[in-house]
């Protein structure tokens, strides 16, 4: 029996010829990552046990991303702990506040390549699976162990395969494909399983949209999300990689827990209503819902393609004399400094600001209800982020709706959840 791409990567890193689902292994890692929320806990664990040396300062990445710029004294002290650890151990890959969100930075910097085994003290570490790597989130104790030893202990997951075929409708993006997937299988439908995505539709997606899909694998309970490398992957990696890579593909006779196959041409832009990412509805069934805030950003949809799509909608509105609805505040946060600079170069930031958006430095910010866009009681936000649990973006009685950047931009203009065609087609009809 053949192996899946996930099993091949894990076998290689465990020093075995093959591994099987359910098998417990100790595997060598290529990179350990933590942020300003999770790294201080790991650092305290290392100090508690008197561990004063990391396994390799060039194989650890620490990113200040969640509560930056520091929102209060506690978050400032958290960041200070990380900075002092970086200086003490000579950590090479340290990213200060404003550099961006880890799940945008690490691929940009070429710190994750195909065939890698990456562990990160953040649940959305699965994002890197878009590069054909096995990447998974772990707790601060596990990341402390990984930083000390260069190893991780885990159970080999079963794999599930999701095949999409057909041409996407206008305004349908990778975000809609992953929302559709979660809507079909539920938030525990892939519990501790590797979610492998394939099919002509996936192959036609940009790397940015593939990152979005892998990013939200955890929202279905997935241990990881992964897409086998192809020409697009290699082209992306060639320009960035800091070290050699190895391409793995699933064997034709690999065994899967289950295989799903869907016609993507039948999917329209979707919205996940509160309070689960699986509570998915078409935009056409959501247009009665008014909003107070719109957020475009996060590690899910804060990349340059996302900003371009949103800017297209805002630009169409501006040509009609429309801006962000007077009762709505719209926050745009590029996922990294590099993305911010590119957006400036392309004139996207000018469009956002002219349309009435607030544009901020790269940070996780409102996604986790941290700061820079926290919701009050009873407020509603439509967001390009990845979670909409009670209190996720602020008050426990606030509501978060998840959608792609085009839908969020259109909603910001209309003051309610809206299909992008309501703005962009209106421009065409008006002859503007």
Curated annotation (Swiss-Prot):
Alphabetized GO MF terms: 3-isopropylmalate dehydratase activity; 4 iron, 4 sulfur cluster binding; metal ion binding
The protein's Enzyme Commission number: 4.2.1.33
Cofactor(s) for this UniProt protein: [4Fe-4S] cluster
Reactions performed catalytically: (2R,3S)-3-isopropylmalate = (2S)-2-isopropylmalate
Keyword Plastid: no
Domain of life according to the entry: Bacteria
Gene Ontology terms describing biological process: L-leucine biosynthetic process
Record-listed [4Fe-4S] cluster binding positions: 299, 364, 367
Cofactor, free-text remark: Binds 1 [4Fe-4S] cluster per subunit.
InterPro entries, per the entry: Acnase/IPM_dHydase_lsu_aba_1/3 (IPR015931), Acoase/IPM_deHydtase_lsu_aba (IPR001030), Aconitase_4Fe-4S_BS (IPR018136), Aconitase_4Fe-4S_dom (IPR036008), HAcnase/IPMdehydase_lsu_prok (IPR011826), Homoacnase/IPMdehydase_lsu (IPR006251), IPM_dehydratase_rel_enz (IPR050067), IPMI_cat (IPR033941)
UniProtKB keywords: 4Fe-4S, Amino-acid biosynthesis, Branched-chain amino acid biosynthesis, Iron, Iron-sulfur, Leucine biosynthesis, Lyase, Metal-binding
PROSITE patterns: ACONITASE_1 (PS00450), ACONITASE_2 (PS01244)
Pathway listed: Amino-acid biosynthesis; L-leucine biosynthesis; L-leucine from 3-methyl-2-oxobutanoate: step 2/4
Keyword Amino-acid biosynthesis part of the UniProt annotation: yes
CDD domains in UniProt: IPMI
Function comment: Catalyzes the isomerization between 2-isopropylmalate and 3-isopropylmalate, via the formation of 2-isopropylmaleate.
Family assignment from sequence similarity: Belongs to the aconitase/IPM isomerase family. LeuC type 2 subfamily.
Subunit structure: Heterodimer of LeuC and LeuD.
Entry-linked HAMAP family: LeuC_type2
Protein name: 3-isopropylmalate dehydratase large subunit
């Amino acid at each position: 029996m053949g192996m899946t791409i996930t099993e091949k990567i894990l076998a290689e890193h465990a020093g075995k010829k093959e591994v099987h689902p359910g098998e417990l292994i100790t595997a060598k890692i290529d990179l350990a990552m933590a942020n300003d929320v999770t790294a201080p806990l790991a650092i305290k664990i290392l100090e508690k046990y008197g561990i004063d040396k990391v396994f390799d300062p060039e194989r650890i990445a620490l990113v200040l991303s969640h509560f930056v710029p520091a929102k209060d004294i506690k978050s400032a002290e958290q960041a200070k702990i990380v900075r002092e650890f970086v200086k003490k151990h000579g950590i090479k890959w340290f990213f200060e506040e404003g550099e961006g969100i880890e799940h945008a930075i690490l691929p940009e910097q070429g710190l994750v390549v195909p065939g890698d085994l990456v562990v990160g003290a953040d649940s959305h570490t699965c994002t890197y699976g878009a590069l054909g790597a096995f990447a998974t989130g772990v707790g601060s104790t596990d990341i402390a162990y990984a930083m000390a030893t260069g190893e991780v202990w885990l159970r080999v997951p079963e794999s599930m395969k999701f095949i999409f075929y057909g041409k996407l409708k206008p305004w349908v993006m990778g975000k809609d494909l992953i929302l559709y997937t979660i809507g079909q299988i539920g938030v525990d439908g892939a519990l501790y399983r590797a979610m492998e995505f394939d099919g002509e539709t996936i192959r036609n997606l940009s790397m940015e949209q593939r990152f979005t899909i892998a990013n939200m694998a955890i929202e279905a309970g997935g241990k990881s999300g992964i897409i086998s490398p192809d020409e697009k992957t290699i082209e992306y990696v060639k320009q960035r990689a800091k070290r050699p890579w190895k391409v793995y593909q699933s064997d034709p006779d690999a065994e899967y827990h289950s295989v799903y196959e869907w016609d993507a041409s039948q999917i329209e832009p979707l919205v996940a209503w509160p309070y689960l990412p699986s509570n998915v509805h078409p935009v056409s069934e959501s247009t009665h819902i008014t909003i107070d805030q719109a957020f475009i950003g996060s590690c899910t949809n804060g990349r340059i393609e996302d900003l371009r799509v949103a800017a297209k909608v805002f630009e169409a509105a501006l040509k009609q004399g429309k801006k962000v609805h007077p009762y709505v505040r719209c926050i745009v946060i590029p996922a990294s400094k590099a993305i911010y600079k590119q957006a400036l170069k392309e004139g996207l930031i000018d469009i956002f600001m002219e349309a009435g958006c607030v544009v901020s430095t790269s940070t996780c910010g409102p996604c986790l209800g941290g700061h820079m866009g926290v919701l009050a009681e009873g407020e509603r936000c439509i967001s390009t982020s990845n979670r909409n649990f009670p209190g996720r973006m602020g008050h426990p009685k606030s509501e978060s709706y998840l959608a792609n950047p085009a839908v969020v931009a259109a909603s910001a203009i209309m003051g309610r959840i809206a299909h992008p065609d309501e703005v962009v087609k209106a421009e065409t009809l008006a002859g503007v």
